[in-house]
Amino acid sequence: LPIVITDMRNPEKTTTIERKPNNDNGHPIKIITGKKNCAILRIEDEFVHKLLESLENKKRYSEFVILSPFTKDGIKFSRILFLDGDYIKRNEKYVLGFDPLATITYNRGVITLIGDEMWRVQQIVSKTSAKIGESGLNILNIDAQEETSRIIVVVEDTGNNIEKAISAIHEERSNIKFI
């Protein structure tokens, strides 16, 4: 999306700034991070907006990622990944108070891949998830978003699972390329 700057005194003079991605600008995966001690909240979709608004405005807490929703027995649920499991434990009663069907799963670890235009990378999710699986880990959730060029992989946070997953992705990194 180009940015056009116009001279207010002489509108005929303009400057256009436009990003032109270079296909040869290095590897598409720029950063691989790991975070231990996370939690996932499952909450009915109708209550999630009030909870998130309350967390952000009243509690001033925003260290969470909204994961893909699911439907079970005709009820639509949202899933929220909290990056600080201890915070959720301390505020569990408050968080669960928004929905009687809400549940929290602790001991989750998150691996995040951040890059440039990863949507152009063929099989990036399948290659990284296969390599994580080959290292003996069970992937509990994967969330990939074209708009953010971010991939989130959730695994159980036990032992050295996070380190193993990061190492596995680094091993596969050389096989991941732009199309």
Where are the model-predicted features located?
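C-terminal catalytic "cap/lid" subdomain
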Residues: L1-I179
